């Protein structure tokens, strides 16, 4: 959003993509973040282990499946500290690397009534370069992508990404889809691990820790050298959830994918001229 040109550019060495995601989280994340989103596990007594060849293949395929499902409905929840939580509900198109949705900030506001706990809300758009915020048009109850089309480029407050949990989550989210699978052998060699088998909304998913950060020593540090990124992948390589542990925060940033959103058409206005 911080730029108006093409946002797609492919990284020459795709094998480094997973390590780039880890860098976004600033590594060295707080202890206990993963435990906050363990959920229901079918294998509570089974120890974690390195991924098998089949599991690495599914994990490697998950990014392509996400790309092919575009546009996809997403929900991002980020804890900013001090009891403040930001929730973004939107749609991501991995073919254009653009996304649009609504955001809501909650916390202790001191207010009463229907708006108790709500600190802010509005529309949000983001791409690989940054994000933009705008107020919801008065009296417009359409979907966020429809509302955003009627707000000119000049109506958006745009900025580049920072290192706060929301921005890190948006950056992670916009980069998850890809037009080809990753290298499963590289994922396995880089320390991806099977953690458990969980159920989400009645469906089974394998929970994986992503590859280790570059230079991390297995078993070292409070997190055992494990990646701050955790993925929930089904038997067909479909990605359902990703969590990202952040430094100093006990609750990880969470991204939920709920499938193809066939009704959505991402607007051109936020990325258009200055009208």
Language-model features: locations:
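N-terminal leader/targeting segments and the immediate start of mature chains
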Residues: 2-91, 95-97, 264, 270-275
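Structured extracytoplasmic
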Residues: 35-39, 45-51, 129, 143, ...
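Beta-turn initiation residues at beta-strand->coil junctions
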Residues: 76-79, 102-106, 134-137, 243-248
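Solvent-exposed loop/turn segments connecting transmembrane beta-strands
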Residues: 80-85, 109-112, 248-251
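Short, surface-exposed charged micro-motifs
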Residues: 89-91, 121-124, 228-232
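Solvent-exposed helix/loop surface patches that form functional interfaces
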Residues: 149-203, 271
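Gly/Pro-enriched, hydrophobic low-complexity segments
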Residues: 197-273
């Amino acid at each position: 959003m911080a730029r108006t040109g093409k946002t797609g550019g492919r990284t020459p060495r795709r094998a480094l993509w997973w390590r780039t995601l880890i860098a976004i989280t600033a590594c060295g994340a707080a202890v206990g973040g993963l435990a906050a989103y363990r959920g229901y596990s079918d294998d509570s007594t089974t120890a974690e282990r390195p991924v098998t060849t089949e599991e690495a293949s599914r994990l490697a395929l998950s990014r392509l499946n996400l790309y092919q499902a575009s546009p996809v409905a997403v929900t991002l929840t980020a804890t900013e500290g001090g009891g403040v939580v930001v929730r973004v509900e939107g749609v991501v198109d991995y073919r254009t690397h653009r996304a649009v949705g609504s955001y809501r900030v909650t916390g202790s506001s001191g207010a009463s009534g229907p708006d108790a706990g709500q600190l802010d809300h509005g529309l949000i758009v983001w791409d690989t370069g940054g994000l933009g915020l705008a107020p919801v048009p008065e009296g417009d109850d359409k979907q966020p992508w429809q509302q955003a089309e009627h707000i000119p480029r000049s109506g958006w407050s745009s900025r580049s990404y920072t290192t706060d949990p929301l921005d890190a989550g948006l950056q992670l989210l916009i980069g998850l889809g890809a037009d080809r699978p990753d290298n499963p052998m590289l994922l396995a060699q880089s320390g991806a691990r099977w953690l458990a088998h969980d159920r989400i909304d009645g469906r089974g998913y394998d929970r994986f820790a992503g590859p280790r950060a570059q230079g991390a020593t297995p078993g070292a540090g409070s997190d055992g050298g494990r990646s701050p990124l955790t993925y929930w992948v089904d038997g067909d390589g479909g990605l359902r959830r990703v969590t990202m542990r952040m430094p100093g925060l006990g609750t990880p940033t969470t991204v939920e994918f709920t499938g193809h959103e066939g009704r959505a058409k991402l607007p051109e206005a936020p990325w258009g001229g200055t009208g």
